[in-house]
Amino acid sequence: MAHKKAGGSSRNGRDSKGQRLGCKKFGGETVKAGNIIYRQRGTQIHPGNNVGCGKDYTLFALIEGIVTFERMGRDRKKVSVYPN
């Protein structure tokens, strides 16, 4: 039985890249139609007025306007875009 492991075999060297999720446009910012506002897995934040939801739950602006984050009840948030 060898007591030394053969050189050059590493077990730890791998890591996945970050997915670049999160807020892309913050409250008060101006957006154009089609701009991505929030990237997420599942609905952490729900689409509000003038905001669309992609099949991967990405929230995007449907009109040009100003982004506002609002509460829906006690435990939910939504993002809306209002014309300026």
UniProtKB/Swiss-Prot annotation:
Belongs to the bacterial ribosomal protein bL27 family. The keyword Transferase does not apply. HAMAP family: Ribosomal_bL27. The gene is rpmA. The lineage of its organism: Bacteria, Pseudomonadati, Thermodesulfobacteriota, Desulfuromonadia, Desulfuromonadales. This is Large ribosomal subunit protein bL27. InterPro entries: Ribosomal_bL27 (IPR001684), Ribosomal_bL27_CS (IPR018261). It comes from Pelobacter propionicus (strain DSM 2379 / NBRC 103807 / OttBd1). Pfam families: Ribosomal_L27. Residues 1-24 are annotated as: Disordered.
